[in-house]
Amino acid sequence: IPALMAGNAVVQKADNQTAKTVQLARDLAVEAGVPQGIWQVVHGDAAEVGNAVTDNADYIAFTGSTPTGRIVAERAAKRLIGYSLELGGKNPMIVLPGANLEQAAEIALGSAFGNAGQLCVSIERLYVPNHALAEFEAILKRRIESMQVGSSSEFAHDIGSLTSKAQIERVAGFVDRAVAEGAKVLTGGEKLEQLGPNFYAPTVLTAVPKTAEVLTKEVF
């Protein structure tokens, strides 16, 4: 939208998991008066259509994985065009000494589990002072286990489904491998197949070994 407001035409490669949402947003913009050809949406496999988009654009804005970001940067550099990249991360939240632990837990819930944790800005690590750790864990566990997990169109639930089978297997794999290395499950750590094929319980791991990939690699 900012690109359109600045007077640019936009070609957008829609994520295959949210393609209808992107298309609807574009159609509503046209309905509101945006000229038909100013905002174009491209659908398809990124490996097939990605180069066609990046090799013909005047500027590239990419959100995705770090390996793909390197490819985009290389192709943009060869053409001497500008680009911006929002790539993988492992966002931490630090609870400071003297913090209000109830408030900190509330912030952690929204930051970690908004959109079922499927946001680039979601936190994936929590650092808590040793003297407050036990109390904070108890508060966090209580709050998480009171969350309503499910799916409805009435916004009656606090957390919903993951987007795909591939995503739930990725999440489960990270958790299972961490537990195998010695991490402890404070809460969650399991699929909720009774709710649907892609539901996974909101999960917190403690005592995660420094060697565990869940501590260093982005889960989403």
Where in this protein do the model-derived segments appear?
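Rossmann-like NAD(P) dinucleotide-binding subdomain of oxidoreductase/dehydrogenase enzymes
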Residues: I1-Q103
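ALDH superfamily catalytic-core signature
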Residues: G33, A57-Y59, P67-E213, E218
